[in-house]
Amino acid sequence: MKFIIKLFPEITIKSQSVRLRFIKILTGNIRNVLKHYDETLAVVRHWDNIEVRAKDENQRLAIRDALTRIPGIHHILEVEDVPFTDMHDIFEKALAQYREQLEGKTFCVRVKRRGKHEFSSIEVERYVGGGLNQHIESARVKLTNPDVTVHLEVEDDRLLLIKGRYEGIGGFPIGTQEDVLSLISGGFDSGVSSYMLMRRGCRVHYCFFNLGGAAHEIGVRQVAHYLWNRFGSSHRVRFVAINFEPVVGEILEKVDDGQMGVVLKRMMVRAASKVAERYGVQALVTGEALGQVSSQTLTNLRLIDNVSDTLILRPLISYDKEHIINLARQIGTEDFARTMPEYCGVISKSPTVKAIKAKIEAEEENFDFSILDKVVEEANNVDIREIAQQTQQEVVEVETVSGFGPNDVILDIRSVDEQDDKPLKVEGVDVVSLPFYKLSTKFGDLDQSKTWLLWCERGVMSRLQALYLREQGFENVKAYRP
């Protein structure tokens, strides 16, 4: 099996040295991601494309799907690489490959050619197109907007029969730009903004300010792990959790009601800047959009930025909520965001939309900054790859079982698409499907006389959700790992 990786167009217009560096980094990223599927897989870089060759046909769909989610790839061609002798041989191979696909359809042939040959690309298009038209009675040629375009590539004595084209996410390869720290809350905005910076070539680390206890952190860990695993797993990143409840308590006690929102954001930027400086990160990323809430007016954003020298990136600054939600749906974080527990310890009855710097600074003079220093010092820093392991260590009260008893039911908490692609069937026990994002609202409707064994493919989500349900008072849950 062979895939041809086509580069994002912005890479191809770089200078020779920069283009070569980007291609080298992208090649390494592809190897890092795909080695989990096939250790014998070969990734070979060229000036115009990257080849991926693998032997394990069972991993074809998984490899193809993974490639479409690696930043820097414009599209992927799944090809069959065969030798040929002459133009008629090319036609015969094309006929065998595309006959069924062209039945009753309009088509055209498009050929790309590299190397020295006795024919041109146009001559191959005419010869193959004419032959297909003669040998497939129900098909007819249509050069503009055909039903099917037959793509062929001729390189020296090899013919590439294009079996399928699949769009990538584009952007720059991760690692071509410097690291950033995303202030992630688990909602729509922060997830999308994190994705946008990954797509632009940044390694995105995550900083979470916990205002609402373990359940909130569990949910945010899920979002961060999902984003990393889906779009950024070629690189190691950090997940930093800061317990911000003491800071919120100090704000509630010492700060005027109308200034609370801006002061809280300033404290978050101060804390995140300290974390960024500690790890050599160049910029912060937030999901703020202009005018979305009271703290996101230009005046207030300027005051928030003033507390730190660290660059703050806001990729969603001009986006409306509908656009952001649509992007969240495309990248798969919508369901997380919709069910994310919302905690706001600082709720102003009449928040200011045009804060005055002198007044904000006067309010902050009452704040005990040693509290802020302490929570940053005690921040929990985790390699995002270890989230599963740490969850297992932390959730000692959630039992993990490999077997089942007469009163047990397996609860498949994967997404609907994953369940449809690979249904779970276990002999001797009932299996019930309930996607993870519906557990908070639907688990209570299940038969509570049963013991529910939560299952997902990697075991991360099942343990996190089991802890969440335990915290909600459900004692009849365990994690299932056969």
Swiss-Prot record:
Pathway the protein acts in: Cofactor biosynthesis; thiamine diphosphate biosynthesis
SUPFAM superfamilies hit by this protein: Adenine nucleotide alpha hydrolases-like, Rhodanese/Cell cycle control phosphatase, THUMP domain-like
Entries under Gene3D superfamilies matching the protein: 3.30.2130.30, HUPs (3.40.50.620), Rhodanese-like domain (3.40.250.10)
Main location: cytoplasm
Statement: the UniProt record of this protein carries the keyword Ion transport: no
GO MF term set: ATP binding; CCA tRNA nucleotidyltransferase activity; tRNA binding; tRNA-uracil-4 sulfurtransferase activity
Keywords (A to Z) from UniProt: ATP-binding, Cytoplasm, Disulfide bond, Nucleotide-binding, Redox-active center, RNA-binding, Thiamine biosynthesis, Transferase, tRNA-binding
Cystine residue pairs: 344-456
One GO process term, biological-process aspect: thiamine diphosphate biosynthetic process
Function per UniProt: Catalyzes the ATP-dependent transfer of a sulfur to tRNA to produce 4-thiouridine in position 8 of tRNAs, which functions as a near-UV photosensor. Also catalyzes the transfer of sulfur to the sulfur carrier protein ThiS, forming ThiS-thiocarboxylate. This is a step in the synthesis of thiazole, in the thiamine biosynthesis pathway. The sulfur is donated as persulfide by IscS.
Protein name, entry field: tRNA sulfurtransferase
Organism from which the protein derives: Salmonella gallinarum (strain 287/91 / NCTC 13346)
Lineage: Bacteria, Pseudomonadati, Pseudomonadota, Gammaproteobacteria, Enterobacterales
Name of the gene this protein is made from: thiI
